[in-house]
């Protein structure tokens, strides 16, 4: 038996064994699979979300892998103000752990977990960075109603008519006026506007100063075949006109000779 035949038989046996082992693994995995409960499915979805955030963070991260590695969230639960300093990946990790606690019995939440949840929703970070009274008993600065409420009657009854409160616009509250001020622009927008105006003025001045002499020359591409064809047709027309004129002249000349002969 040659070496090529031995090699072919060995490859055939190896491929058959590999296929048999993969088929057995697939059957075992299929038998061991079971339907996940809603809690387990939610946990698996959270794991996939964290893994996706890790993958995205690893793509945009130019430093070490510490920025995409899980962190110890205990200091964040103890001091909620640290949440605003975390990157997007670590904030997602904290939110995931906090959501897992919220999905369970709310009565078992600790004060630290409640404070962290309140800080994430109403704390002085991001759009609410100037809300410095988040950890006090005072009402939020943009509360949509007055505190304390104005009572019209000292002894209200069940049949009293209740009137609608006057609307309170959040954009007019003192802490929100600067955020909703549309007359101001950020430096980046101003820079782009100034660059656009400069380019427009430069283009207008250049158009005025350049005039007709600076206009770009139009390149006309001539078709030599078509040009020669038109010239040939023009010559043929001229030749036909000349021939027709010559015939008319001969006709008139013969007519003159005829009239003279009659006289």
UniProtKB/Swiss-Prot annotation:
Keywords: Membrane, Mitochondrion, Transit peptide, Transmembrane, Transmembrane helix
Any one GO biological process: mitochondrial electron transport, cytochrome c to oxygen
Transit peptide residues according to the UniProt entry: 1-26
Any one GO CC term of the record: respiratory chain complex IV
Pfam family, one: COX4
InterPro entries cross-referenced by the UniProt entry: Cyt_c_oxidase_su4_fam, Cyt_c_oxidase_su4_sf
Subcellular compartments: Mitochondrion membrane
Regions crossing the membrane: 188-204
Region (Disordered): 232-252
Topology in the lipid bilayer: Single-pass membrane protein
Physiological role: Involved in respiratory growth and required for cell survival in the absence of prohibitins.
Sequence similarity: Belongs to the GEP7 family.
This protein's name: Genetic interactor of prohibitin 7, mitochondrial
